[in-house]
């Protein structure tokens, strides 16, 4: 009975369809990920440009498949910013993880800020657009605080 309940729950949230195929969050998220990878392969070095996902997606596919962004920070970075963006993204994520553990070891409360930055930039979960002003303000308003804490 518990297996059926678990399967039903996964079907409800779109992780498994009746054909028992497991999806990356949902069929739609999986489709956006595939489109992002295709756009990346066509524009490896610089990507299609910030906020270019929808424009390029509409050119390549029908409008029903396209959204303003791929709903995942990692896929947005590779499709819109290319290799240059992904290198900066990996460096930034690595720095955030390093600083998080450094602050955690020192019992410094700044680890919470690094944790929130990692959650925002997390490559494993669906997300809003990286170039959405509201999301950027919410998540990066803490950066001046880190600067002040470091030098005071």
What role is predicted for each listed range?
Residues 80-120:
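Hydrophobic transmembrane alpha-helices and their immediate junctions
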Residues 112-125, 129-152:
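Transmembrane alpha-helices of multi-pass inner-membrane enzymes
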